[in-house]
């Protein structure tokens, strides 16, 4: 019986690891599906695809292993040069001030980007910019079930999409409090 406690701890730990792997696999599947949908949408409009949030992020290991988190698109925008290093059409700019004319892009794919903005106000400003420059927006962000999403110190918002509605929730605010503040409809 002295090892029973250790078996319980091991079982719980293994359960958490399996759960987080399944969450990660779900996020990866969602990201790849949305990227492919964004690419197909841009092609159907005969316009370029904008990637907001570089495929390499701020992880140098992705460059070394040549493992981008997603495709490059036609134009890639990020505030961090490392995230877009090597892209032939890389633009260093903020998602809240995109330096392109209205509806330049058929679609924009924003991956693991908006949750880094400090407030819902800035996230709405970014969403307005994305809507201004592209005909369709495809957003990917960490799942609420992702432990790393909760622990990441630079994640200030929860972001999710339901069809053509994008939701923002400032971390630390009650879900009862002004739900309207967190919801933005877009076409």
PLM regions with names:
Residues 2-44:
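Class I SAM-dependent methyltransferase Rossmann-like catalytic core
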Residues 5-8, 106, 169:
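Compositionally biased, low-structure terminal segments
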Residues 25, 29, 68, 147-152:
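Alpha-helical membrane-targeting segments
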Residues 31-41, 54, 60-67, 140, ...:
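A broadly tuned "polar low-complexity/structure-edge" signature
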Residues 35-39, 45-49, 73, 87-88, ...:
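Generic structural motif recognizing short loop/turn segments at the entrances and edges of beta-strands
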Residues 45-59, 176-187:
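Metal-centered catalytic cores of metalloenzymes
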Residues 47-146:
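Conserved SAM-binding loop
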Residues 120-187:
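S-adenosyl-L-methionine-dependent methyltransferase catalytic module, highlighting the catalytic core
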């Amino acid at each position: 019986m002295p090892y029973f406690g250790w078996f319980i701890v091991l079982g719980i730990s293994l359960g958490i690891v399996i759960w987080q792997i399944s969450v990660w696999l779900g996020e990866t599947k969602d990201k790849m599906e949305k990227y492919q949908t964004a690419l197909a949408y841009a092609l159907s409009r005969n316009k370029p695809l904008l990637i907001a949030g570089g495929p390499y992020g701020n992880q140098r290991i992705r460059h070394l292993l040549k493992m981008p988190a997603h495709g490059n698109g036609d134009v890639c925008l990020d505030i961090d040069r490392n995230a877009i290093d090597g892209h032939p059409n890389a633009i260093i700019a903020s998602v809240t001030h995109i330096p392109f004319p209205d509806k330049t892009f058929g679609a924009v794919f924003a991956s693991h980007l908006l949750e880094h903005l400090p407030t819902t106000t800035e996230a709405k400003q970014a969403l307005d910019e994305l809507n201004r420059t592209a005909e369709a927006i495809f957003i990917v962000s960490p799942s609420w079930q992702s432990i790393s999403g909760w622990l990441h110190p630079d994640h200030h918002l929860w972001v999710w999409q339901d069809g053509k509605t994008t939701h923002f929730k400032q971390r630390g605010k009650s879900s009862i409090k002004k739900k309207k503040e967190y919801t933005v409809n877009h076409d």
